[in-house]
Amino acid sequence: HEAMIIREERIGNQRLLLGDCREIIGGLTFDAIVTDPPYGLGKRMQGGTWGAKDHNSGFLKWDLSAPDWLPEAIGQTPAIVWGGNYLPFPPSRCWLMWNKVNAVPTMADFEQAWTNLDRPSKRMDLPVGRVEYGHPTQKPLALMEWCLGFLPDAKTILDPFMGSGTTLVACQRMGRH
């Protein structure tokens, strides 16, 4: 699987792999998955709404179903998947909810993460960050640290999508890999 890795970087104690996650994932070992898959690919934000006149135009196939390899990659591995309520995962006993206490009125008041954890659902009240990092759906660092708190025995965390790197920063701050 190393041939599928385009580039490898070290950031602190973290290992960042550049490549197609669908090809790389089979050769990796990890204790848990914490991720926020991309969604709304091909859509443009227009005044706080998603293409208000033609709501369904512009969505790519990615948005219509879970990546076929993701449920298999999860298997029995503890997992937290943001946006999982939009994907056809099995029923969950434990949903994590981020209550955006200062959400923009035209956007969602909260976000949900699907988990395969055997515990009651939980909610975190946390303001939406006002810092612009160039990523349209960046999760707050405190939110990702909260997620890692549900996985105390997981030392190696997989985030196959990376996004703005918030999971990586949370892992670094919490002594995870």
Annotate each PLM feature.
Residues 1-158, 162-177:
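Class I S-adenosyl-L-methionine-dependent methyltransferase catalytic core
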